[in-house]
């Protein structure tokens, strides 16, 4: 998706799981079109080696971003069935505006 404004870059998160070390970083992006009164916002998570791409952008930049969407289903402790959508980033670059 093109013409997105970087609204917020979240801190790097790291940890260790059964499969080894992991890292991720989330970025909040917003549609950058002045004609839209209420622009959509997207929370995109970059993981593993893709985390380094976030270093090339800063808050306020206009970027293009590519992601895949995944829905994760789960059950709460009280038994309710829930679902959450995740946007997994696989490419982000600053646009020449």
Protein language model annotation of sequence segments:
Residues 1-97:
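Single-stranded nucleic acid-binding surfaces, predominantly the OB-fold ssDNA-binding core
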């Amino acid at each position: 998706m093109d013409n997105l404004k970087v609204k917020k870059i979240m801190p790097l998160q790291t940890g260790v799981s059964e499969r080894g070390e992991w890292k991720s970083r989330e970025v909040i992006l917003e549609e950058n079109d002045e004609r839209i009164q209420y622009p959509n916002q997207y929370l995109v998570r970059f993981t593993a080696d893709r985390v380094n791409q976030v270093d090339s952008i800063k808050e306020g930049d206009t970027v293009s971003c590519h992601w895949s969407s995944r829905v994760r289903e789960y059950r709460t402790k009280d038994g309710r069935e829930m679902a959450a959508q995740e946007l997994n980033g696989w490419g982000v670059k600053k646009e020449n505006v």
